[in-house]
Amino acid sequence: MSTGIFGEQLPKHTKIEYIGDVPIIEECPRDIKTLNGEPVLLFGKWSFENVVVKDPGLRRYICLKPVLLPHTEGRYQKHRFGKARIPIVERLINLMMRPGRNTGKKHKAYNIVKRAFDIIYYKTGQNPIQVLVDAIINVAPREEVTRIIMGGIAYTVSVDVSPQRRLDLALRWITEGARTCSFNNPKPIEECLADEIIAAASNDPRSYAVRKREELERIAAASR
């Protein structure tokens, strides 16, 4: 038995394709699992069935594998490209545990996201999973800047952003926007998170994540 890029056991004659030294990431399985004949629903409410990732570049990295409870117990932590196998809602929950005093309080973060999804549905009437995916696609940056040194002089140059980093930055900015909104504000953080996701999904400039993406891409455009 050979081992896949995520540490899983592959059949004896399975062939892994590579581009150079980098293995090709396969899209996360989307089979709608059933439990006692019933479809698996996130939090017992939300279906993964008709959720569409419109950005081809992120399709292999946004994991929409149907789960009832988004908690993989860190099983992909040490695997290369393991983040691509973690359900996207769990990644949002994990980032809600940052920083400082919220570290490790996953049940608290779980309840925040669960209530935020209810608020998203009440405000939009749409599947919250689809709204989250649309928000991620809208705020994921396509280029950023990096520093290079030539002849002892440092320059900033524009570079394309890899799909995995695009997803990481999008989730980081969405959760940062929710925490920033709730700080010193009577509005609960779950409502702030819901408002941030809805604003990002509609590409609203009032969204913290949308402003961060525009700022980064503006700096990158000036460094071409």
Swiss-Prot record:
It comes from the Archaea. It holds the Pfam family Ribosomal_S7. PROSITE patterns: RIBOSOMAL_S7. One of the primary rRNA binding proteins, it binds directly to 16S rRNA where it nucleates assembly of the head domain of the 30S subunit. Is located at the subunit interface close to the decoding center. Part of the 30S ribosomal subunit. PANTHER family: RIBOSOMAL PROTEIN S7. This is Small ribosomal subunit protein uS7. It comes from Pyrobaculum islandicum (strain DSM 4184 / JCM 9189 / GEO3).
